[in-house]
Amino acid sequence: MGNKWCGIFLTILLLAQMSQTIFGQNPNIPADDHHGAVPPELVMSAVVLKDGRIANYYINATVIETEFNNNPCPCVNQTELKAERLKVLKLWSAYTNYDQQYILDSYEQFATPDTLPDGTVNQFLHQFVVNGYATYSANSVAAEYALQANDANIHLFSELDPVSVEWQADNITVIYKIITNYTLPGLPGAPILDGFVNTHYVKFVPCKAEIWIDIMTQDSLVSTYLAAAQSNHPASDICDKIQQACTGPNQVYDSYESCLNYMSVVVNHTSFCPTGSLIANSSGCHYFHASSALNYPEIHCQHVRPYDSPTCQDFCLTQGCGNCDSNAECVFVSGSNSIVPKYQCKCKSGYVGNGTHCSPVTCSAQWQCPSEYNYGSCQNGLCGCNSGNGFKWVPDQATVNSHQACQCSENETVQWYNGVPECMPIGRCRYVWQCPQAATQYTSITCTKYGQNALVPFNTCLCNYGYDNLGFSYKCQCSVPKREIWSNVRQGTLCLAPNECTDNYHCASNNCQVQPGQWLGTCAA
């Protein structure tokens, strides 16, 4: 496109962005303009206006998911834009690695702001979604939650896995993985859980490097562990915080006693929604918002009000689990890239069906529950899977008939250890030959323990020194000007910079100078 037409396009783009119409329908709806029941596709967003006031908006997730599938930027150098976005992703992935001020600065620098310079509400309100757990919007609310990744009870250290980056065809979306280490001094035993792999689904503002939407799917072991670690908070603990924070125009209860009456019901309420979520009518959800109200009462007091909290409701009942069989459970649809969480009914172990209708698979002896790898079991008159080693029940009649009811989860493979089958996540190992890189890069990887993590009983497939990435489930990449070369000293293939060496033959001078006690040296001139 010529400079003249580019100039015209950029002028149109600027004017359209000012009116916020160029890239499809504006998904934002002022809460005061919406009347009646709130449909599930509308997500509450608390916007901090220029004067400091809080304004509630509903964000139409359907508009975002359908109106932004094609985002051309004819006058933008796509290579430069992608490089700038990648630079932002590397910094964004690591914002929890430093102090809380660094987190706030990262949100101010990289995430879309609540308002534009002229004071109008941004069409692209920032969304941070932790799949199956909670949604935080807009910028200030998301930043507030991110601060919890760096406090006295938890600390996260993360880095982008550069070879995992997958740019999507819509010109604004990228999917990538980060390697995260969790330090949790606030939980029993003060566990250190290293080497989890979390997946991010990020949308940028069209034609820019501003992060609009960030959807994170946590490693399944993280979700399971945190759900189990979540305690049930007493009604008095919740109401003490509400009494302190929600006063004046933010008051939501007539008295402390009325708060106790309501929260006592919440504490004793058994939610059908998945445990560990902050989008359920649970004491955990109310406690989180009551605690957060101490800093942001305008935002969080509304979430602890009785009966019509915008967030602490059993949303799973309207998002797929409203008609489950009594022998089914509600599960989050893993891998969802939707702003609005999706759930489904799933028959419990020992039953088959579609979740809304579940039929028992009865037995009186184990031989009546055949399964591959001999992992079927008969307990209390129902077929199931032996506990341990990761095999899960698949509630499908055809699968049961083909003796495959006990299977590994997605992204796991069956491996054998001491004559016993086990489900092993791809990228984990007990031996090098189990690594996905082994077929072509056997000498470039090791099967080694990565940090500390009592939840992961396996070693990890790690690339040798110098490679661009850690390894896990991806091939080891060695970018120029580095080169892959065999090291006699290390008995493996390394990725060395031009002046690095471990053996004399690595150098044009045939002289590798290595300091005493070291194995890596530099080539002499």
Swiss-Prot record:
PROSITE patterns registered for this protein in UniProt: EGF_2
Subcellular localization(s) per the UniProt record: Secreted
Domain EGF-like: 317-359
InterPro entries associated with the record: EGF-like_dom
Coiled coil (residue ranges): none
Keyword Signal set for record: yes
Transmembrane stretches, start-end: none
Residues with attached carbohydrate: N60, N77, N171, N181, N268, N281, N354, N411
Entry's Gene Ontology cellular component terms: extracellular region
Top-rank taxon: Viruses
Signal peptide: 1-24
Presence of keyword Signal: yes
Xref: Gene3D superfamilies: Laminin (2.10.25.10)
Cystines in this chain: C321-C330, C324-C345, C347-C358
Keywords: Disulfide bond, EGF-like domain, Glycoprotein, Secreted, Signal
Protein name: Putative EGF-like domain-containing protein R659
Protein's organism: Acanthamoeba polyphaga mimivirus
